[in-house]
Regions:
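Extracytoplasmic
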Residues: 39-43, 60-62, 66-70, 89, ...
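A short, well-structured edge-of-sheet supersecondary motif
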Residues: 25-61, 230-231
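Conserved catalytic neighborhood of penicillin-recognizing serine enzymes
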Residues: 88-128, 156, 161
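Mid-domain, small-residue-enriched loop/turn segments at the edges of structured enzyme/sensor domains
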Residues: 119-177
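Active-site SXXK
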Residues: 54, 64-94, 106, 240
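Bacterial N-terminal signal peptides
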Residues: 5-15
Length: 281
């Protein structure tokens, strides 16, 4: 069994809008995650950020992991940015099918054909990568179409089509705060992601029943990912990225990590009041 040292850090993200001191509650989450990962054969990267307060944690937060189908969040965001700029609409048709339908298939059912149709329409992998870089998203690489990704020999440590956990959470943060797409487009995107049909045994599995989750999974041989938003009981949203490669029982590991994150951030709400950050309306 290959052992991977786990580097834990509890700091504000470089790109986060606020700098928040680490609380003892999140330190305990680090310890729980450290114990959890020590018992796992998979290599796991985690990042989580309270979008209201800026409190954050990460495990291997700066290590690239293959995105698999979680790249579809970036494809959707670029298309919606083009909608916001008047270049496209969700009612446009491509190959006889509306973009709205293609978006649903791509994000809800992780349909690879629909993803590649939208990939091509926004300009391909290079266009998505360039858009992320131009908007200050560092740590994400987009190199291949989904068809190319599936056809190529798979290497769990290939840095093509990869993201660090922190970079993925930064993408989610900026989507949520309306920095990459409009509030209207953000609400549409989160509404579709809330219907995600894949990965029911991952991020959502061990959360309390009824917990709102908007997420996108990624799966390849030896890879299991889940990224998105978890809404806490008081309405705070936590942006979460969990990547797992190699080893066994990766979905269960993702579910356990998500529950530890949920419980840890929930304890923060007993602390003195922290005002919510203003988000785009």
């Amino acid at each position: 069994m290959r052992f991977f040292a786990i580097l834990l850090s509890l700091t504000a993200f470089v790109a986060a809008p606020v700098s928040a001191a680490a609380s003892p509650d999140l330190v305990s989450v680090e310890q729980q995650l450290q114990s959890l990962m020590a018992d796992k054969s998979a290599d796991v990267g985690v990042a989580a950020l309270d979008l209201n307060t800026g409190e954050s944690l990460s495990i291997k937060g700066d290590t690239p992991f293959p995105m698999a189908s979680t790249v579809k969040v970036a494809i959707a965001a670029l298309y919606l940015s083009q909608v916001d700029h008047g270049q496209k609409t969700l009612d446009d048709t491509i190959r006889g099918e509306s973009v709205r339908s293609l978006m649903g298939k791509m994000l809800i059912y992780s349909d690879n054909r629909a993803a590649d149709v939208l990939f091509k329409d926004v300009g391909g992998p290079h266009a998505v990568h360039r858009w992320l870089v131009d908007n200050g998203i560092q740590g994400v690489r987009v190199d291949r179409t989904i068809a190319q990704l599936l056809a190529d020999k798979r290497d769990l440590w290939d840095t093509r089509d990869s993201s660090t956990p922190k970079a993925m959470v930064d993408l989610l943060r900026r989507i949520y705060r309306g920095e990459l797409i409009s509030a209207h487009s953000r609400n549409y995107l989160l509404g579709v992601m809330a219907k995600c049909h894949t990965g029911k045994n991952r991020m959502k599995w061990l959360l309390p029943a009824g917990t709102p989750v908007e997420h996108k999974t990624g799966t390849l041989n030896g890879l299991s990912d889940d990224v998105g938003f978890i809404t806490m009981p008081d309405g705070h949203r936590i942006a979460v990225a969990i990547f797992a490669r190699g080893g066994a029982n990766r979905p269960q590991t993702i579910a356990q990590a998500a529950r530890a994150i949920y419980d840890g951030f929930k304890t923060l709400f007993s602390w003195p009041y922290r005002p919510a950050l203003t988000t785009a309306q």
